Amino acid sequence: MTQQHRRTVPWLARAVLAALLTVAAAVHADPIVLKTTELGHGPTIVIVHALGGTRNDWLPTARRLLAHYRVVLVELPGHGESPLPEPFSFAAVGEALDGVLAKQNPDSTIVVGHQFGGRAALAALAAHPGRAKGLVLLDVPLGLPMQMEDQRKKMFLDFMDNSYESVAKMMFSKLGRDTTQSAEIFTMFQQTSPATVKAFVREGFFTDGNKDAKSLKIPIQRVATSRLWKPELTSGAVLKTLGWDDTTSTVLRLPNSGLWAMKDQPDSLAAIIGQFAVARFAAAKK
């Protein structure tokens, strides 16, 4: 072996060792821990908020549930103090949420997911069946309402990267039940990191949540706000707008409500969740 080879071998060994250690560190990295707010006692309702929101958005509805339930409000990754998984995927978000679900009693737990919080819930329950007895989904998109070529998706996402403020305003400035509330929502939404928004939107464009939804063996209660469910639309048309393959499923309409449905209609929404929970827990005891 030449002198040059003797120098090269230790260098290669060190490089290989460093690479192996890097991979090992990634494999054994600490899981993402999501921040939660836990209130009350009794059977558990786990609630995951929407993109651009906070877990405290759900306090008005949570308070209506506290007489009979323990409520766990979960922070969506990339919001507040809960980090965004790297690399990002709904599967990774679901794994982070499962860290919360795994601590609950599966025989007395219902999960509520709002918008992309619903995609997180679907991913978690698809990967870990048996964590809950039922799922309530509020305005949850499973895919795009129409077929779009990957090239067009990429063009839109590139435009979002280059003109984030314009795209964010186009997508998220009309989510309220009226123009005044829409402006308030968008002001709050702008506090969310653009990296978080881009990650969720990109994943929403390129993944299909129907597979997760179809894999679940537990009942799903679908709920739509009146912002989405206009009077002239059928429930099937609403589900199609949200990208659902199954447009025959039952949907409950929440009147006079937008993205802040949990604030707009806390009594009605709590009643829907509570009635669903009662039915599911009763069925589980049979």
What are the roles of these predicted feature ranges?
Residues 2-16:
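Bacterial N-terminal signal peptides that target proteins for export
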Residues 23-26:
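N-terminal signal peptide c-region/cleavage motif recognized by signal peptidases
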Residues 32, 37-83:
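Conserved HGGG/HGGXW glycine-rich cap/lid loop of the alpha/beta-hydrolase fold
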Residues 146-147, 159-217:
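Conserved alpha/beta-hydrolase catalytic His-Asp/Glu region
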Residues 220-263:
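Conserved loop-alpha-helix segment in the C-terminal half of the alpha/beta-hydrolase fold
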